[in-house]
Amino acid sequence: MIFYVVFYAAAFFLFYHLIDRIVKKNKKSEQGKQGQQNRQNTVIKKSAPRTVRYTTPGNGIWPLFEDALRQHHLLIAGKTGSGKSVVENGIIDTLLHRLPFDKLGNAQMILIDPKGNELYKYAKLPHTLVYAYQPEEMLKALQYAMDLTAERFQVLRETGDDYYNGSDVYVFIDEFADLMTTQGKTVKPLIQRLCQLGRAARVHVVICTQTPIAKVIPTEIKCNFDSRFGLRTRSAQDSRNIIGKTGLELLPEYGEGYYMTPKEESYYKIPYVTKDEIRETIAWWEDQMQQNGLNPRKAA
C-alpha cells in the first residue's frame, strides 16, 4: 500500500514538474515573440542621419529633400508644431536650388494653400504655374493639374512611351484636411485621379496633414502615397495611421522624423531652412525674373 502511495506521489510530482516547464517555456517563447513584434512595430532610431548640405550659389541642397523630390507622391504628417512646414519649405527650397537657370522648365509647381499663409511667398516665382487659396481657385488649380496630366497622357499614347519625357510638376497641398473639409466631395475624385495617373505623367502630389485618418484622406487616395515623412504625433494610433507602426508619438516635439519610401525607412534629424534663407532664395529668383524677362505664374 505504501509503495503505491509513494509511486503515485512521485508520478504526480514528475507530471506537475513537466507541465510547469512546458508552460514556462511557452510563456517565455510568447514573450519573445511579443518583444520581437513590438520592436518591429516601433520606430527604431538610426544613427548618422543625413544632414550634409550640398552647396550651390546662395544656399544649397539637402540630400534628404532631394530624395523626397524623386518620389512619385509624398505625404507629410504630424501634429501641430511638429515641423510639417519646415519639411515642406525645405523641399521647395531644394527644388529652387537644384535647377540651373537655363533648365528652369525641368520642375514647376502648382501651389494649393487653403489657409493662404504658408505658400503665398512662392506665388510669383517663375516655377509656379498656379497659386490658389480661395475655394474656387483651389478647385481650378486641381482641374488645371488634371488637364495637364491628361495632355501628357495624350503624348504618351502618341509616342508609345511608358513615362512622359519632360518636366516634373509638383502639386503642393498645404493643410489637406482644410481642403477636404470645405470641398471634399468635389476635389476627392480629382485628387484620386491625379494620384493614379500622375506617376506616368511626372506629376507629383505632395500633401501636408496632421493625421491621415480615413475621414481626412480616403483610402483610395492614401494608398498612392507610399513615400512619407512621419513627424511627432499625439498618439500611437496616429503614428500607425502615418507609417504603419508606433513610435512617432515618442519623437521630440520638433526637429526629428521618420522618412519612409519603397526603398528605405530611416530616422532623421530634419534639416532646417531658415526664413532668411528662403527670403534670399526668393529674392534671387525675383531678380532673375527682372533681368531675364521671365514670365510670372500662370493664372488658374
Question: Could you describe each region identified by the protein language model?
Answer:
Residues I2, V6, F12-R157, G166-Y170, ...:
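P-loop NTPase catalytic phosphate-binding loop
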Residues Q290-R297:
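Short, cationic low-complexity segments
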